[in-house]
Amino acid sequence: MTDNKNRPAAGILGTKLGMTQVFDEKNRVVPVTVIKAGPNVVTQIRTEERDGYSAVQVAFGAIDPRKVNKPVAGQFAKAGVTPRRHIAEIRVADASSFEVGQEINADVFEEGSYVDVTGTSKGKGYAGTMKRHGFRGQGASHGAQAVHRRPGSIGGCATPGRVFKGMRMAGRMGNDRVTTQNLSVHKVDAENGLLLIKGAIPGRKGGVVIVKSAVKGGAHA
């Protein structure tokens, strides 16, 4: 396994292709998520001296140039690259190792390193408290009258006389930005631009994800 603490921070935008299973060196089944990683292109560089922090802005995905507004088109023109659909800024330890127009591919990661994957979770629509928050519901019998899936009390009448902010209630479920931390990179297929990451990641098939070096440095390695 690779220790992230001794490696520079890295990141890449990609597309979730789905899940499959592979075998490790001991013939054990390993569930993996396949990500089409990149190619990304560096469109802007942030430095400590000028911006107060170190990061690179990367772009990913094809788009018709006619669908890009003028400010964004000007940003791409300044970088000397064709317009892309998605833009993200990724913090790095040393931005001087990057340059505008540089291409970033799947080989930015090594097998055995640990990553954090950010995506948009699947939308579930309007959901009640039992599905959305895991409430147990109320009694199934013994006088329970049409309250089996209701949440119960949401606050007092006179004191406090209001519903506190953050009260867990029914509402839209999913379609949130979610990050899963400390996932192991099982395999890097640089030739096909694929990352095989052990375990599940947020989002649907075809969803755009950001893969970054684990901020906790592979805490469970």
UniProtKB/Swiss-Prot annotation:
Annotated InterPro entries: Ribosomal_uL3, Ribosomal_uL3_bac/org-type, Ribosomal_uL3_CS, Transl_B-barrel_sf
Quaternary structure, from the entry: Part of the 50S ribosomal subunit. Forms a cluster with proteins L14 and L19.
Protein name: Large ribosomal subunit protein uL3
The organism's place on the tree of life at top rank: Bacteria
Cellular component GO terms held in the UniProt record: cytosolic large ribosomal subunit
Gene name in the database record: rplC
MF term (GO), any: rRNA binding
Alphabetized SUPFAM superfamilies for the sequence: Translation proteins (SSF50447)
